[in-house]
Design a protein with these regions (language model features):
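Extracytoplasmic metal-acquisition and chelation regions
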Residues: 1-114
Length: 114
């Protein structure tokens, strides 16, 4: 993937969660299935945070496509952090790893290797 990015060809990034929408509660419409079916790589946090998108991806992705759950790959269950908006009883962490530079570096490494 890094080589393709460096060459400047072949990459189209499509976000499926509309701007201003809570990605944790987003229920993807059927049109998202079409986007997922065309993808070579689908990147999500994982960690139980986008289950409807993950389920739709698994049901619609083409053969050879990769589902990359970056948070699941980087953050161990023993490292999960819970807070008022993501209580432990709910079973889903509040990683916000994208605001932590070492975590972001790990995320990028996982995506590169996917």
């Amino acid at each position: 993937m890094a080589g393709v990015l460096a060459a400047g060809t072949g990459i189209e990034v499509v976000g499926v969660v509309p701007e201003g929408t809570n990605s944790h509660t987003f229920e993807p419409p059927p049109s998202v299935a079409r986007e997922l079916a065309e993808a070579d790589l689908v990147v999500v946090n994982g960690l139980g945070l986008e289950d409807p998108i993950i389920e739709m991806a698994q049901a619609n992705m083409k053969d050879g496509a990769v589902l990359c759950e970056v948070g699941t790959a980087v953050i161990l269950r023993s490292e999960w952090v819970f807070d008022f908006s993501f209580p432990q009883e709910g079973g889903r962490p509040n990683p916000h790893a994208w605001t932590n530079p070492p975590s972001v570096l790990s995320y990028v490494t996982v995506m590169r290797d996917a």
